[in-house]
Amino acid sequence: MKVIEGAIVAPNAKVAIVIARFNSFINESLLSGALDTLKRQGQVSYDNITIIRCPGAYELPLVAQLTAKSDRYDAIIALGSVIRGGTHFEYVASECNKGLAQVALDYNIPVAFGVLTVDYLEQAIERAGTKAGNKGAEAALMLLEMVNILAQVES
């Protein structure tokens, strides 16, 4: 019986991080967590990481789609935060989620969902590196594993 599992180390992976500027004080913490995980656990060279900034979470799927279409990356991490009450929460959160999932399916590329969808600012702060861990770091871990799984499945 063959079992395929993803390792965390992916030193040659080419990773694009698409990050929203809206709520940047939260998103920058997510970015720090993702970069730290890619470097320390994934052993990904900073030369293989590209950071692409866009206005907000609603724009993440389009930027991720164009990034995937370029065929220059093995995986994409999408980072952002949508806080209920600050925007049209349901629309932005839903379209962001659906759009990023569609990019992964259309282009056969892992797209890690590191977008916080929370009710309160305090929840976002907790999930960006305090009480509830760092969801940017968690997205990077998922991405590293998926890069290795897809490499095995495709070979």
From Swiss-Prot:
Residues that, per the record, bind 5-amino-6-(D-ribitylamino)uracil: F22, A57, Y58, E59, S81, V82, I83, F113
UniProt key word Protein biosynthesis: no
Active site: H88
Example of a GO cellular component annotation carried by this entry: riboflavin synthase complex
EC class (word): transferase
SUPFAM superfamilies (UniProt xref): Lumazine synthase (SSF52121)
Lineage: superkingdom: Bacteria
Binding-site positions, (2S)-2-hydroxy-3-oxobutyl phosphate: G86, T87, R127
Pathway it works in: Cofactor biosynthesis; riboflavin biosynthesis; riboflavin from 2-hydroxy-3-oxobutyl phosphate and 5-amino-6-(D-ribitylamino)uracil: step 1/2
GO terms classed as biological process: riboflavin biosynthetic process
The name this protein goes by in its record: 6,7-dimethyl-8-ribityllumazine synthase
Gene behind this protein: ribH
